[in-house]
Amino acid sequence: MEKLWGRIAAVPADRVKTLEDGEVIQLSPFEIRAIATPGHASHHHVYHWDDSVFGGDIAGVRIGLGPPIPPFVPPELHIEQWHDSIAKIRALNARHLYLPHFGKIEGEVSDHLAALDERVDRWSEWLRDKIQASMKEDKLRSAFATYEHDDLGMGSSVTNIEGLITDYETADPSHMAVSGALRYWQKYHPDQISTEQSTLS
């Protein structure tokens, strides 16, 4: 975390406030609405102000001219909730979407969300099929890294695709998707994977 974000300073407990879905934060003259958007994590919120949404991880990772990808991470990955959260963001009809990884999406927010939505399904189903086939976790990590890297390069106009892949791996390491998917399929849909793989350790 320090490599990515620098030193994280402690926040006094009396300055921490838990927000509920739909709660409005008054920062005069601004009113910012917190919207619960689980899927990446159960506590995740996006923040809506005027025609802008500060999307957090649920809105995907997108670097430069690369595509939006979903940061699948353990332990709280939940695919159905992720789709519901994307639908919530889409319904806001925002003109600007701000991503923590990284930057501002403007004028193509709907396209960004559609591409992210499609990739959530495609990646989760690819991982499910490999888990169902009893692929060992170490091999699955390697296979998924190759799959993701090929996906990043497909149709990309980036000339330095290796550099782009390195940047994506730094921001969102592909091995975390394997850990997140294993737990998700084992916990929520054990009937869709093999019996041998369907028990959480």
What kind of feature is each model-predicted range?
Residues 1-36, 42-110:
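Metallo-beta-lactamase
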Residues 1-4, 24, 48-53, 66, ...:
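Generic structural signal for short, solvent-exposed loop/turn connectors between secondary structure elements
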Residues 2-10, 58-71, 122-124:
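Active-site-proximal loop/helix segment associated with metal-binding centers of metalloenzymes
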Residues 15, 21, 65-68, 112:
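Glycine-rich, flexible loop/turn motifs
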Residues 74-81, 119, 173-177:
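Soluble or luminal CAZymes and related metallo-dependent hydrolases
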Residues 80, 85-146:
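Active-site/pore-lining binding-face segments in mid-to-C-terminal subdomains
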Residues 129-201:
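C-terminal regulatory/interaction regions
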